[in-house]
Curated annotation (Swiss-Prot):
The gene is PCMP-E5. This is Putative pentatricopeptide repeat-containing protein At1g77010, mitochondrial. Pfam families: E_motif (PF20431), PPR (PF01535), PPR_1 (PF12854), PPR_2 (PF13041). Keywords: Mitochondrion, Repeat, Transit peptide. The lineage of its organism: Eukaryota, Viridiplantae, Streptophyta, Embryophyta, Tracheophyta. PPR repeats lie at residues 61-91, 92-122, 123-157, 159-184, 186-220, 221-251, 252-282, 283-313, 317-351, 352-382, 383-417, 418-448, 449-483, 484-514, 515-549, 550-585, 586-616. It is found in: Mitochondrion. The keyword Transit peptide applies. Coiled coil: none annotated. Belongs to the PPR family. PCMP-E subfamily. It comes from Arabidopsis thaliana (Mouse-ear cress).
Length: 695
C-alpha cells in the first residue's frame, strides 16, 4: 500500500499513518525505508530516522536499523552512518559489512580496514570487500596479505584479487596465483585468467585454460568465448581466433575488436579492414582497434583519415584521442595535434591521465616544449605515468633540475621513472648523472631492461669510453639482453663513436633488424666517420630490406652527405623524402641541406632554400651561409648573410667580425670601421681564442 504513493506529501502521510500504529510493524518500516532509498529523498530519510529512534525501533529491530544504515552508506554520508552505527545496541554481519563497504567505496580504505579489524566475527563477504577494495585501488600487497590471511579462501575473493592484478598491470602475478592455489575455478575465474593470458600473449597457457574448460564441461558463454578469441588473436593464432568467433551466435564488439587487432598485429591490415567494414553501426571499440592497427603498421595517415570518418558515426573516447595524438607525433603534425587538444577540452577528456600524458609527449616531440609545460601546469590530477611524461618533456628542453624535482615527487618510483631519468641524462650529455642513477638502480635491486642499458651505453659512447661501454654490455649479456635490438643499436653507436666502424658493422650484420633503429645507428656511424658513400649504400639496402625510413633516417643520411660534400646525392635524398615518402622536412632537414649547399659553394641555392622555408629562420642557417661565402669569396652574399645574423642575433660577435673582414678585403675600410664601432656600441665582444698543448 505504501509503495503506491508517489507524491512526497502522500509518502509522508504514509509514515504518519505508521507512526499512529501501536503494533510492531517492522516489515512496513523496512518497505518504507526501501521506498525512501528508491526515491533518494534525504529529508524523508532523516524524518524516518527520527521516527524510528522515537519509537525505539533502532534498538529493538536490527533489520530496520540496518536498512537505514545502508541508505546512508550508499549515499556516501559516512559520518551520519557512523553515528547511527554507534547508537545501535545490536549489530550483525550486515551492520559491520555495510560500514566496511561504505568506507571502502568512499575512498577511506584505512577506516574500512580498522572496522574490519574490530569486527567480532567475519564472513566471506567481509573478506571479499576489503580484498577487492584494496585490489581495485592498486594496493595489491595489502590485498594479497589479507587474502593470505583468510581462514577459508573462496572463489569470489580469488576472482576479485585476480581482477585487481590484471587491472593494475600485473597479469603475470595473476597467473602465478592461479597456478599456486589450484582452485576449483568457476567460469568467472577462467575468463579472468584468460585475460591475463591475452595480456602476456601466453599462448601455451591460454591453450591449457581452454583445455581445462573443455574437459571440465564448463559452459562457454559469450564472455568466455570472447576471451578465448582475444587470447588467440593477441597471440597470433588467427585460425583459432576465427574459429572461436564462429562459435559465438552474436559476436560482441569486444570479440570483433580482438580479431581486428590480431590481424593488424600480424601485418594483415587488409583482412583487418575487411572484418571492420563488414560490421554496421560500429561502436568506438571497433574504431579504436582499426585506428590502432593502422598506427601499429606505420600507416599513420590512414589512421587520421579513418578518424575523420569515425567522427561522422560516433564520438571519440580517450583511447581514440591517445591513438590519434600518437599518429600526429609520428608524422610531426603539430597543428593536428593541437586540434586533438581542442577535442579533448571540448569533450571533457583533458583530465584523462593517458590523454594528458600523450599530449605532453606530442608537444615535446613536435618541438613545442613550452606548450607541454603550460599543459602540465593546468593538469589537476597526476599519476606516475603523467609525471614520467613530464620528466621527458623537461629533459627535451634541457630543464634538468625541473626533471629532477618531478622525479622526487613520484612516491612509488617505477622502473619507467628511473629509465626516464637515465635516458634524459644521457640525451643531455650528463654522463656522470646517467651512471650515478644507473648505479642507484643496481643498489635498489631494480631490474635492468633494454631502456636503462641502452641509455648507459649511449652515455659511454658520448665520451668515447669503449671499455666502460663494453662492461655495461657485459651486464646485458648476463641478463639475456645482448641480442635485444635497442641494446645492440646502442652498441653499434658506441663502436662507431669510438672509431671502430668495422666492429659496429659486425654487430649490425649479426643482429635482428625489425625496424629502422639499427639502420639509423649504422648509417649515423658511417656519417660521423666520414664514410658518406657507405652510408648512402646502406640507406638503399634498407629500402630493399622492406624497412621504411623515418625522418630521423633522412636526417642521418643527409648528415652523411653534408660531412662528405655529396651535394647531388643530398639533393636527390631531400627530394625523395618529400615526393617518394610523403615526409614534410622539418627545420633540421632544411638546416642540414643549407649547410651542405653553402659548404660546396652553392650559396645562392642555399639562400633560396632558406627564403622558401616554411619556418622562422634562425641565425644558425645564415651562419652556415656566411661560412660558405667566406670560404668561396662571395662578398656580396656574405654581407647579406652577416646583416641577417646581426638582425636576428645582435650579440653574435662572429657576424660583426666577418662583416668587417668582408668590407676590409674589398677595400671599404670606412664601412669596416663602422661595423667595428657598431660592435663596440652594442657591447659585443669576441672572446679571444686559445689552445692547449701537452708539455
Amino acid at each position: 500500500m505504501i509503495l503506491k504513493y508517489n507524491s512526497s506529501y502522500r509518502f509522508y502521510l504514509s509514515s504518519s499513518f505508521l507512526q499512529a500504529m501501536e503494533v510492531d510493524c517492522r516489515r512496513y518500516y523496512v518497505r518504507l525505508l526501501q521506498s525512501c532509498s528508491s526515491r533518494n529523498r534525504e529529508t524523508l530519510w532523516r524524518q524516518t530516522n527520527g521516527l524510528l529512534l522515537k519509537k525505539g525501533f533502532l534498538s529493538s529491530i536490527v533489520i530496520v536499523a540496518n536498512h537505514l544504515l545502508q541508505m546512508y552508506s550508499r549515499s556516501g554520508k559516512m559520518g551520519i552512518a557512523r553515528n547511527l552505527f554507534d547508537e545501535m545496541p545490536d549489530r550483525n554481519y550486515f551492520s559491520w559489512n555495510t560500514m566496511i563497504e561504505g568506507y571502502m567505496n568512499s575512498g577511506e580504505k584505512g577506516t574500512s580496514l580498522r572496522f574490519f579489524d574490530m569486527m567480532p566475527e567475519r564472513d566471506g563477504y567481509s573478506w571479499n570487500v576489503v580484498v577487492s577494495g584494496f585490489a581495485k585501488a592498486g594496493e595489491l600487497s595489502v590485498a594479497r596479505r589479507l587474502f593470505n590471511a583468510m581462514p577459508e579462501k573462496d572463489v569470489v575473493t580469488l576472482n576479485s584479487l585476480l581482477h585487481g592484478y590484471i587491472l593494475n598491470g600485473y597479469a603475470e602475478e595473476a597467473l602465478r596465483l592461479f597456478k599456486e592455489l589450484n582452485f576449483s575455478a568457476d567460469a568467472i575465474t577462467l575468463t579472468t585468467v584468460l585475460k591475463a593470458c591475452a595480456e602476456l600473449e601466453a599462448l601455451k597457457c591460454g591453450k591449457q585454460i581452454h583445455a581445462q574448460i573443455l574437459i571440465g564441461g564448463v559452459e562457454c558463454d559469450s564472455k568466455m568465448n570472447s576471451s578465448l578469441v582475444n587470447v588467440y588473436a593477441k597471440c597470433g593464432d588467427l585460425r583459432m581466433a576465427s574459429y572461436m568467433l564462429e562459435q559465438i551466435r552474436e559476436p560482441d564488439d569486444h570479440s570483433l575488436s580482438a580479431l581486428i587487432s590480431g590481424y593488424a598485429n600480424c601485418g594483415r591490415v587488409n583482412e583487418s579492414r575487411g572484418l571492420f567494414d563488414r560490421k554496421s553501426n560500429r561502436c568506438v571499440i571497433l574504431w579504436n582497434s582499426m585506428i590502432s592497427g593502422y598506427i601499429a603498421n606505420n600507416m599513420k595517415m590512414e589512421a587520421l583519415v579513418l578518424f575523420n570518418e569515425m567522427r561522422n558515426e560516433t564520438r571519440e573516447d580517450s583511447r581514440t584521442l591517445a591513438a590519434v595524438i600518437n599518429a600526429c607525433i609520428g608524422l610531426g603534425f603539430l597543428e593536428t595535434g593541437k586540434q586533438m587538444h581542442c577535442h579533448a577540452c571540448k569533450f571533457g577528456l583533458i583530465d584523462d591521465i593517458v590523454v594528458a600524458s600523450t599530449l605532453l609527449d606530442m608537444y615535446s616531440k613536435c618541438g613545442s616544449p613550452m606548450e607541454a609545460c603550460k599543459l602540465f601546469s593546468e593538469v589537476e590530477s597526476y599519476d606516475t605515468i603523467l609525471l614520467n611524461s613530464m620528466i621527458k618533456v623537461y629533459f627535451s628542453c634541457g630543464r634538468i633540475d625541473d626533471a629532477k624535482r618531478v622525479f622526487e615527487r613520484i612516491e612509488n618510483k617505477s622502473l619507467i621513472s628511473w629509465n626516464s631519468m637515465t635516458n634524459g641524462f644521457s640525451q643531455n650529455g650528463c654522463t656522470v648523472e646517467t651512471l650515478e642513477y644507473f648505479h642507484q638502480m643496481h643498489k635498489l635491486d631494480l631490474p635492468t631492461d633494454e631502456v636503462s642499458l641502452s641509455s648507459v651505453i649511449s652515455a659511454c659512447a658520448s665520451i668515447s669510453s669503449l671499455e666502460l661501454g663494453e662492461q655495461v654490455f657485459a651486464r646485458a649479456t648476463i641478463v639475456g639482453l645482448d641480442s635485444d635490438q635497442v641494446v645492440s643499436s646502442s652498441l653499434i653507436d658506441l663502436y662507431c663513436k669510438c672509431g671502430f666502424v668495422e666492429h659496429g658493422r659486425r654487430v649490425f650484420d649479426t643482429m635482428v633488424k625489425s625496424d629502422e633503429v639499427p639502420w639509423n645507428s649504422m648509417i649515423s656511424g658511417y656519417a660521423t666517420n666520414g664514410q658518406g658513400f657507405e652510408a648512402i649504400d646502406l640507406f638503399k639496402k634498407m629500402s630493399v630490406a622492406g624497412i621504411r625510413p623515418t625522418q630521423i633516417t633522412f636526417m642521418v643520411v643527409l648528415t652523411a652527405c653534408n660531412y662528405c660534400g655529396l651535394v647531388e646525392e643530398g639533393r636527390k635524398l631531400f627530394e625523395s623524402m618529400k615526393v617518394d615518402h610523403g615526409f614534410v622536412p622539418d627545420k633540421e632537414h632544411f638546416s642540414c641541406m643549407v649547410d651542405l649547399l653553402a659548404r660546396a659553394g652553392y650559396v645562392e641555392e642555399a639562400i633560396n632554400l632558406v627564403e622558401e622555408m616554411p619556418f622562422d629562420v634562425d641565425g644558425s642557417m645564415w651562419s652556415s651561409i656566411l661560412r660558405g661565402c667566406v670560404a668561396n669569396g662571395y662578398k656580396a652574399m656574405g654581407k647579406k648573410a652577416a646583416e641577417k645574423i646581426i638582425e636576428l642575433e645582435p650579440e653574435n660577435s662572429v657576424a660583426y667580425v666577418q662583416l668587417s673582414a668582408i668590407f676590409a678585403t674589398s677595400g671599404d675600410w670606412e664601412s669596416s670601421a663602422l661595423v667595428r664601432k657598431l660592435m663596440r656600441e652594442n657591447n659585443v665582444t669576441k672572446n679571444p681564442g686559445s689552445s692547449w698543448t701537452d708539455c
